[in-house]
Amino acid sequence: MPRDVDVVLKGHSLEGRKVLLGISGGIAAVETVRLARELRRHGAEIHVIMTRAATEVISPLAVRWATQANVDVEWDGDMAQLDGYDGLLVAPATRNTLAKHVNGVMDSPLVMAMSAATGNGTPVMVVPSMHNDLFDDAVTQDLLKEVAVRGAKVLVSPSEEGRRKQPDPVSIVAEFAHHLNRTLNHRNVLVLLGGTESSIDDVRVVTNRSTGHTGFAICDGLHRLGHRVTILAGRTSFDVDDSRFKVIYSPDAASMKCWAKDLIENDDLGIDTVISAAAISDHVMKESFSGKLSSDDVLDLQLVPFPKIIDGMVSWLGKKRGSNAGPVVGFKLLSGDDDEALVEAARSQIERSGVSAVVANDISWVQGDGRRALWVTKDEVSELADVESIVVAIDGLLLAQG
């Protein structure tokens, strides 16, 4: 039976990582319990340092319950703030704490930890939270710029109700994981997701039932693991807009092909890897009708095969990136077929398109509770239990060819 303090693991982006969580005395410190548990859901091993002011907002006992870790407030002989950590997250980061750090005032274990992390190159992320008038003050802006110049990531939310509130825990942990995991070996990834459509007339379209959820989960997972992601989205069942990603909407199959080529060839984006998780139409309308067809009309729709977009991606990447081109990963969905047929279809795509790997699944797996997909390469077939497993497999391929 799970204990009250336990959490359910959602991902592995912080697995095995020693994270120092710093809490200063802003009112946003009341969010620490939720933030700490979200860190743990992604595998983080946490140690906590609070300022005295923070203990007036939330008790060390509550923080210890949430983190299942030691909580330091006062100086002690262990000097845990100088231990080796994989990353330092300061949330909330008050102006007072930032000013002390920038100006070398070292009157608390937290400020010492910030200085030590800066000195030894440990990734640092600060999350300021304050009223707009304080945030917009020139002194605050200078402090934030200086913190960023010293290598820290500064995560600021949009203004809401006259305040820069602390972002939600899911967003904070996602950005912190990305900052912690980002290295020179990580890729600039283009992910195609969602369904495509072909116009019947000016109102109606032929489309498919793809929601885009799997593709977006892959984007989220790859971002947390340190990759930079650009999204080319077709038709989805949800709003794909997310400040972490550059998002292009192109539900039309033909325009999606043009956008994919343009994005790969865009020097500013530097795309070197493609994940083609979109359900791109195999057939499109031979010719669309103008206006709106009458509901009394008997329709005889002519559909023609649409060229496979993925067939050009390896070539586009190779021409643009040369030896720096990363892998292309395709997706293959069948219905009612056995594993042998799935593997055969996936390897046919590998041979035809030159992709490095294919995520192959049956539609019943997508809708069921069992295994999620097969990971198929030229020489390997393995089972993937869930979307997180798909992310891990793709990440391993990206880093292996980095």
Residue ranges and their predicted role:
Residues 1-402:
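A cross-family phosphate/adenosyl-ligand binding-site feature
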